[in-house]
Regions:
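Short beta-strand micro-motifs in enzyme catalytic cores
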Residues: 27-31, 77, 127-131
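Unchanged
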Residues: 42, 52-54, 59, 84-172, ...
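A generic structural motif
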Residues: 46-47, 71, 175
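A glycine-rich, hydrophobic loop/mini-helix early in the fold
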Residues: 50-83
């Protein structure tokens, strides 16, 4: 029988902890730790002060809005599911609503949390919740000259293919699309949303 998460004791002991770098968005921590009473060893990790959020919008034709931008760190242009971040402790759904409006101009009447994913649990504390939004009310997005975005609408199943083929790059967006596709196939979605997705 598999152990439940609540039954598993923390095997890590922290011997010492040092903040090697600190900025408004994250800390880099260098700890000395022991696993299950073993030898002491160094462990470096990124401790986030902000979390990311993913807001997957579905319009009245069953299409997904994608946003595109040139990512400095990756040195490439990417298509992504809308999203952003906020300080830890703020309401993720409030953040998702704000990011959807900022990046697409849309407001949504209905929201459903799809999942919550760990980005890179071996080195980072970041957790990204993902939502699907429908019943969209369209408006002109307030473009930020410091963050130029391209936008395109694609049928839902085309977006799933893009996620599987690597054309959509952000991991939270890929996970949100695949989670929504699985829930659609299993009949585990509100009927109104399922009807929209089957239009595309």
């Amino acid at each position: 029988m598999e152990s439940q998460q609540s039954d598993i004791m923390n095997p890590w002991s922290v011997i010492s902890s040092h903040t090697a770098f600190d900025c408004p968005y994250f800390q880099i921590r260098q700890d000395v730790v022991s696993l299950a009473g073993g030898a002491a060893r160094s462990y470096s990790s990124v401790r986030m002060k902000y979390y990311g959020v993913c807001a997957l919008p579905i319009d009245e034709k069953g299409r997904v809005t994608l946003v595109g931008q040139y990512r400095y760190v990756l040195d490439r242009f990417t298509w992504e599911v809308p999203g952003g971040g906020a300080a830890i402790g703020t309401d993720p759904l409030v953040t998702a609503r704000a990011e959807l409006k900022e990046e697409t101009g849309c407001r949504a009447e209905h929201w459903l949390k799809l999942m919550e994913g760990m980005v890179s649990p071996g080195v980072s504390s970041e957790i990204v919740p993902a939502y699907v939004a429908w019943g969209l009310v369209h408006a002109q997005p307030a473009d930020d000259p410091q963050e130029p975005l391209s936008r395109r609408w694609v049928p839902f199943h085309r977006a799933v293919d893009m996620a599987l083929g690597g054309e959509i790059a952000n991991l939270a967006g890929v996970a949100a699309l695949l989670a929504l596709d699985v829930r659609l196939r299993r009949g585990n979605l509100p009927q109104a949303l399922a009807r929209l997705l089957r239009k595309a």
